Every structure is written in C-alpha cells, then in structure tokens.
Amino acid sequence: MNNLRDPNALITRHPDWQWQDFLTRACQISAQLKQEQIKSVAFWFDDAALFACAMLACFHSGTRILLPPNLLSENQQWIKENADFLFDDTLFNHYGIAQKHPENPPHFDCHDSTEIWLKTSGSSGQAKILVKTARQMWLEAEAIHQSLPFPQGNHIHLVSSVSVQHHYGLSYRIMLPLIMGWTIARQQQPYPEGLIEESFAAPASIWISSPTLLTRLNLDDAKLHQCPLLGMISSGGVLPADIGNAIRQQLKADVIECYGSTETGAIAFRADDGLWQPTTMTKVGLNSEGALWVDSAWLNQREQTADGAELFEDKFHLLGRIDRIVKFGDKRISLVKIEQDLLRHPWVADCYIAQHPVHFRPAAWVALNLDGIQSYQQLGRSAFVSQLRHFLIKTQEHSGLPRFWRFVETLPRNSQSKISKPDFEQAFLAEKEDAL
C-alpha cells in the first residue's frame, strides 16, 4: 500500500474524505477491536470507502474478515458461527469513535498475515470458503498494478459495477486503488447510467466492470462520450471481440480484460482480443488434459484450473472450460466457442450454452436485443431458430448446433456474471413460452 500518500489527498469523493482522516478512523477502529479482543468480523458494506477503512483496521489489529456473498439465511448462520459481529455502514459510524486520535498515522505492513475468508456464492455447485491473507492480497494488487497501462494519481476516480464482497471487487475496487492512490467511488453502480454519472466526479475515471454490463453500453450516448474516461477493466467472462473493439475505437479508451478466479486471483491480462499475458509474478503451464495450471507469488501452492489452453511462448490462448468441451457423437465441441460465435449475431445480446439437462445435445439460452425480439415476432419461433442455426453452421460442426432453444430479454446472471445451473435447468425443463 502507498503509505507515503499526501495526507491531504482524497480516499473518496461525495463527500470528500482526506487520507489523513481516513487513517485516523482506521486507527480508532483498530484500537477498539483490540480493546474488545475481537477475533473475527463479517463485512457487509454499501460504501466501499468505509469497507476499505474497516479492512485496514482489521489488518492492523489482526482481526479476521469474513466476506459472505449475500445475507441469505445460510450465510447469516455462517456469520453467527464464525464472526463476533457483522460490520456494516451503520456500525461504522460510531464504532471506536471515542478512541484517541493517534499522534502519528501508522505504517500499514504489507506483509501482514491477517486472514480474509471469502465465501463463494455456489452458483456452479457447492459454496466454498477460500482463505486469503492480507499479504497475498497486497502482492496480487501489486501484480495487477504492473500489468495495467494506467498511471498512479489522486486525480483518477475508480468507478465499479461489481460488489466488494467478491474477490474481483476486493482486488480491483479496494486493494488496487489503495496501491495506486486513486479515489474509490463509494457506491456500486450496476447500470451504465450510474457509471457514467459517477465518472464526472473527478478529472479522470477508470471503470471496473463485466462483459455483461459492457455489452449493454449505448455507444451513441453523448454523455458517455463526454466522460473523462481513461479506460475499463473487464472480468467475469469473455468480452465479445466486437464489443471491446467498438469501445476502444469510439471512446478512445483502453479496455483491459483480466482472466482469473477466486481461487487463483489475477492470472493474465490482454488489451485486445489476442493472447493472454500472465502477470510478472505468475507462471503457467498445462496438465496432461491440456488444462491451464497457475503458480503465482500470492498462492500457497500451484492451482489447477479447469480451462483448456494453448501456450505460445510466454502467452496463451484460452479454449474454454474443459468441462465445457463436450463430446457429441465423435466430435469434441467447445460450448464457449458456440457462445462466442452466437454473440456475433446482430439479434443476440447475451447467451449461455450448456448440455440439455435431459437430452445429450447442446441447449442455447439466448437473450435477444430489440432487433432480435422484433425479428422473433415477425418471423415466428421456428423460422427464427432456423436463421440462428444457419448463422452458426458457418463456424460450427453440425453436432455443435444447439438443438434446444429458450429466448428471454435478459439472462439471470449473478453479480459475477455467472449463470447458475438450477436456473439453466429450470429454463429448459419448464414447459412454458419464451419470456419475450
């Protein structure tokens, strides 16, 4: 972390909060945690700047942090069993407020071993609890910093559509700006309009977002073109090449994709639709099945991913998840490749391809844009599906053409842009009309 930041620099805006006052508040909370001998707290903050302050306080006091993905009953129980209390915006306003102000701001140790427990949402199966340390998170943030083309400086405002409760949000929305000296936008902005509005809070802005949101950007919006936008960072899935290139060309802003996971942290980056470049602290290779393994400075051991890849000297090309490379007949079909091809169709806003829950065939769950909905209504379902299959046959084997189709206006992706298996299965098992 940048311990030498100007004390009058800002940590956030609207309202402004100076770095010196931010550190003082962190010291007060740390002192209170030590006084009460608190071993573990769970976080649930709306304000990311308050989250950052409470996080530094916990690092300084050695208090474990629990990050639930949501506050559903099972996570409430997890918090009750493993944390002394839930730390939120309301509690922050008065917790430790009576503690004395330190004469000198503390030096925050980037080698600190305080634990962060991240609980996954379980969207792809059983929820997992992953343990990180403060040292590992700082190391990862430094590697991210070295991989990005953006400068340090207090004039840059980091605006985000992702939650701080997940690893992606924690790394990029909290840890990275603390290293870079950027200001942290307080509120998560899940829609393009909010990101645009918040971007005007500072001389320059950088967005942390996802392919799902970036595909919804209206590149003809005059206000978007007026944004003091330096660039965007996208993760949580593959950004369609035409979308990324259109943003780069029309907004004259860098669009950087990050590849990684909660288990591995950041792995690699790319600034176009080409090969992935691992961080300077990351080594990669392939196992016997052709799936990528990762060994980074912040990992306790080598992590095996489920993503197929091809290596090209010090870079690599992703082929899609091994479990999403399925054999239909005698052909190996990449479900991710079908998605990428289908996303190029002018009617398609979003899509997810998986094996049908009953029949051994690809099934396509497709969100249509306005042109797509209009064409669906004009052509009728059968002719509409035929057109999409005809489009795909240019790039796909016949066995890779989806046999089953469901059409909606929006896919129910979670905050990490993932589709849950139960949602997908329900869409194809339920006998109902397309939701258009």
Positions of PLM-derived features:
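Conserved pre-ATP/AMP-binding loop-to-beta segment of ANL
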Residues: N2-D6, H101-K119, P151-V159
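Conserved AMP-binding/adenylate-forming core of the ANL superfamily
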Residues: L4-Q35, T90, K132-R135
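Conserved AMP-binding A3 loop
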Residues: Q18, H107, E115-E142
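Conserved AMP-binding/adenylate-forming
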Residues: A31-L71, H155-V164, R332
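Conserved AMP-binding/adenylation subdomain of ANL enzymes
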Residues: E142-H157, Q165-I206
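Gly/Ser/Thr-rich phosphate-binding loop
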Residues: L219-G274
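AMP-binding/adenylate-forming catalytic core of the ANL superfamily
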Residues: A306-G400
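Conserved C-terminal "lid"/linker of ANL adenylate-forming enzymes
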Residues: V326, I353, L388-L436
